[in-house]
């Protein structure tokens, strides 16, 4: 169970502790933040409400610990990461249980997230040794007008303190995707987990603690965003911010100052379906892409743009598959579970009601019980409906019928988002041309949008983000180039 056995020390009565200076601590505030179970809508867990003074203390510890960590050999950093990954995977059950209870993720998917996270840590350790173990050597005479009198040595050095802010929907995986690159690169790491997902993150951090990382190198601060959010993101000790979430990231980017930012802020991922597409394949991918984890994924299929000539057939195929989706508790591995909060459910309902008022065709009856919304396919959606543009983050998929490929591309590109998209066709030449025309960070051909495998580049255009994720890109973003130039008194040529 969560907070027991190996993880007993992270819990103080009913309240989970925060992590700083290699210890689990209670906040001087004497206050806690409640975490609601989305399915029961009752308090499931409580975490510490940390203060700004505690944030300051954590930042000072992080700055100090980073200096010595930067001098730790790469192989030793990698060794500790491999150890943390093994502990994480060996103790997946408590974290998976927490994911089920605090974000209503189906049990089997919760286990998968933890195992995937362990694999990501190990991969990052190996990739970091390769990337950071190589330098670069330049000679001055390759540039016109120069003799070979200068030798340039370049290497990658850490940035300092990295602030990691993962989202509720993948709190463990999208935390370690920031933590592991930061640590292998020689940085220290301060984690601010989401409220929904915080307990899963605290269990994950304990795995790093058990692996034996130096005190102060990793910290995990919990609390109310209204009290410590801006204080964290604007803290002068922070040298890099890696954030995944909603449009809060836009506000963070405006306030952060001159530091590297890695931001993934959501999307309105379009699925363009041509008239030659394999419609059975398309239907399966709409179900997988649009309804898995109740549509609460940044890479979910958010709008289907299908050629009119095949729209009727596709809609019927998707309707048949929607009818087979199970709805219920995450403990029972239901396909559709409660969305994360009442406010999220209300927002989704607002989009649905707007579509209803404006004449969309409901392929199923709209049904909601608390935070649980039954899967819904909306046909004949028009561009004047909110659901055509806004991100529902729920189990609702709108279908817009188009009369040309250009119409589909134009709708995709008119969005303020640009995370991912997909195109279904048997003509690879058309697929490549459409991919090039779509203003998104990634285009999937004949598959639903997806983040991963975790070493693939993952980035958004426009309001969907800044920078690129993926193991290699994250390591590079969390380092800077250091150059040393050797000046020779006379030109020197090998074998000259």
UniProtKB/Swiss-Prot annotation:
It is found in: Cytoplasm. Its main location: cytoplasm. InterPro entries: Ald_DH/histidinol_DH, Ald_DH_C, Ald_DH_CS_CYS, Ald_DH_CS_GLU, Ald_DH_N, Aldehyde_DH_dom, ALDH-related_metabolic_enz. NAD(+) binds at residues 245-249. PROSITE patterns: ALDEHYDE_DEHYDR_CYS, ALDEHYDE_DEHYDR_GLU. The keyword Acetylation applies. The active site is at residues 264, 298. Gene3D superfamilies: Aldehyde Dehydrogenase, Chain A, domain 1, Aldehyde Dehydrogenase, Chain A, domain 2. The modification N-acetylalanine is found at residue 2. Keywords: Acetylation, Cytoplasm, NADP, Oxidoreductase, Phosphoprotein. One of its GO terms (cellular component) is cytoplasm. NADP(+) binds at residues 192, 195, 230, 391. GO terms for molecular function: glyceraldehyde-3-phosphate dehydrogenase (NADP+) (non-phosphorylating) activity. Substrate binds at residues 116, 169-170, 297-299, 451. It catalyses: D-glyceraldehyde 3-phosphate + NADP(+) + H2O = (2R)-3-phosphoglycerate + NADPH + 2 H(+). Its EC number is 1.2.1.9. The record marks 169 as: Transition state stabilizer. PANTHER family: ALDEHYDE DEHYDROGENASE (PTHR42991:SF1). Important as a means of generating NADPH for biosynthetic reactions. Belongs to the aldehyde dehydrogenase family. This is NADP-dependent glyceraldehyde-3-phosphate dehydrogenase. It comes from Arabidopsis thaliana (Mouse-ear cress).
